[in-house]
């Protein structure tokens, strides 16, 4: 069978999502950043071994770093050196975006969270967002709105 006749499996471009960020924060401005990874990390991400539940972005010395993202190594991929699953990874942004992020982080109540990790062509990209923390009553309001939208859909579907 030639290579032209082989069918490729459609792969989802999303590697990992931080659903907790959508629950705990109001996400305002979003940015797309490249991620500087090692070879074993790319292999592990291709095997869907990434996790972003408590990841955030730290700005130090004019550079952005992804903190708290876990990439579990494959046992066969990294036998000759020590791997660190939770190491800080550098985010690749242009200067204008870095300045906006640093300025927003200095405002009271704002933080920078990583919302998702995905493939764009053959590169790993990270979507980051400027976020403001939600209070308990904000979370309840969001839940009520979500339930109301579900009820509206049910009524429209029944008709």
From Swiss-Prot:
NCBIfam families: PRK05422.1, smpB. GO terms for cellular component: cytosol. SUPFAM superfamilies: Small protein B (SmpB). Required for rescue of stalled ribosomes mediated by trans-translation. Binds to transfer-messenger RNA (tmRNA), required for stable association of tmRNA with ribosomes. tmRNA and SmpB together mimic tRNA shape, replacing the anticodon stem-loop with SmpB. tmRNA is encoded by the ssrA gene; the 2 termini fold to resemble tRNA(Ala) and it encodes a 'tag peptide', a short internal open reading frame. During trans-translation Ala-aminoacylated tmRNA acts like a tRNA, entering the A-site of stalled ribosomes, displacing the stalled mRNA. This is SsrA-binding protein. GO terms for molecular function: RNA binding. It comes from the Bacteria. Signal peptide: none annotated. Belongs to the SmpB family.
């Amino acid at each position: 069978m030639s290579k032209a006749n082989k069918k490729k499996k459609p792969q989802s471009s999303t590697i990992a999502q931080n659903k907790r960020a959508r629950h705990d924060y109001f996400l305002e401005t979003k940015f797309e950043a490249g991620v500087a990874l090692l070879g074993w990390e790319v292999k592990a991400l291709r095997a869907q071994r990434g996790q972003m539940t408590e990841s955030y972005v730290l700005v130090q010395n004019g550079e952005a770093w992804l903190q708290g993202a876990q990439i579990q190594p494959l046992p066969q991929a990294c036998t000759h050196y020590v791997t660190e699953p939770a190491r800080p990874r550098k985010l690749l942004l242009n200067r204008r975006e870095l300045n906006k992020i640093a300025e927003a982080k200095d405002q009271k109540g704002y933080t920078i969270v990583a919302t998702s990790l995905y493939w764009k062509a053959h590169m790993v990209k990270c979507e980051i967002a400027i976020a403001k923390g939600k209070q308990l009553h904000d979370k309840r309001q969001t839940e009520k709105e979500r339930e109301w939208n579900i009820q509206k859909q049910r009524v429209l579907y029944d008709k």
